[in-house]
């Protein structure tokens, strides 16, 4: 069968970032081991263009319409073969309007297409036309893009489920932060507390956040006991363990 004849470009059972080639688009490098970039449609870029210099860490980086992205149906073997025959890497994505779940569609794209082609992830293949509730946009975007990034798939992301330009950019960057792909603010890890916790974990965590929130890129763990705490904070830069 096909699965026996084709080796996927990623290992679905362990994390390793897909080994795509590096492209430079609008002055930003993406692909390979480069930073995962944030895309935005031209219309939304125009809406925030007057305040980009004041947007801090939530700036849009690349305009989708100017990126040269090639969008295909990953089930279309003719389109897949065309991409695999190209000698130069191209930015690729899944076409809008397909009757596929986002995660399945991008996993199939990564499976079928040569890994040299960087992938632009989307939170939805059916962008809403009217106003949307923020939570209705947040949850699918976090699930779809976050899952794929944790698979090692994706060199850039595009969030369109949230219509507000500034809010959609914040959502995109927060997904990258939560998945460990870009750290632009202090990252905190705290245990849920249990019977071994002998202090108010919630209020202590808030005090620590208030004192350290300016430490961009630092990961701080707050643990409730000395039993599991040291192990759970192994990936942190600094840790606080209560008695």
Predicted features by range, described:
Residues 34-47, 69-75, 126-138:
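Active-site mouth loops of central-metabolism enzymes
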Residues 53, 109, 137, 236-237:
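Short, glycine/charged-enriched secondary-structure capping and boundary segments
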Residues 32-34, 44, 48-51, 200-243:
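C-terminal accessory/binding modules appended to enzymatic or scaffolding proteins
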Residues 30-32, 63-65, 83-88, 233-234:
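Flexible, charged surface loops at secondary-structure boundaries
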Residues 1-27, 76-223:
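Catalytic alpha/beta core domains of metabolic enzymes, predominantly
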Residues 1-66:
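A mid-to-C-terminal "edge-of-domain" accessory segment
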Residues 54, 59, 66-78, 237:
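Active-site regions of enzymes building and remodeling cell-envelope glycoconjugates
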Residues 71, 157-158, 240:
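Conserved beta-strand positions in the central sheet of alpha/beta enzyme cores
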């Amino acid at each position: 069968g096909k699965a026996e004849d084709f080796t996927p470009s990623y290992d679905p059972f362990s994390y390793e970032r897909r080994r795509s080639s590096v492209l430079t688009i609008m002055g930003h490098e993406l692909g390979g081991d480069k930073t995962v970039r944030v895309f935005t449609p031209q219309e939304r870029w125009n809406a925030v263009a007057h305040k980009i210099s004041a947007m801090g860490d939530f700036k849009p980086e690349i305009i989708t319409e100017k990126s040269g992205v090639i969008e295909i149906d990953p089930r279309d073997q003719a389109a897949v073969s065309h991409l695999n025959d190209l000698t130069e890497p191209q930015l690729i994505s899944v076409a809008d309007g397909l009757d596929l779940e986002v995660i399945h569609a991008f996993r199939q794209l990564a499976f079928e297409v040569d890994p040299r082609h960087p992938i632009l992830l989307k939170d939805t293949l059916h962008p809403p036309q009217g106003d949307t509730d923020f939570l209705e946009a947040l949850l699918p975007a976090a699930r779809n893009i976050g899952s794929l990034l944790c698979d090692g798939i994706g060199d850039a992301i595009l969030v369109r489920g949230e219509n507000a330009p500034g809010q959609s950019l914040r959502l995109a960057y927060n997904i990258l932060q939560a998945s460990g792909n870009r750290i632009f603010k202090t990252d905190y890890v705290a245990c849920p507390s249990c019977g071994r916790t002998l202090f108010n974990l919630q209020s202590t965590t808030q005090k620590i956040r208030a004192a350290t929130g300016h430490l961009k890129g630092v990961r701080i763990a707050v643990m409730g006991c000395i039993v599991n705490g040291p192990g759970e904070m192994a990936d942190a830069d600094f840790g606080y363990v209560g008695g």
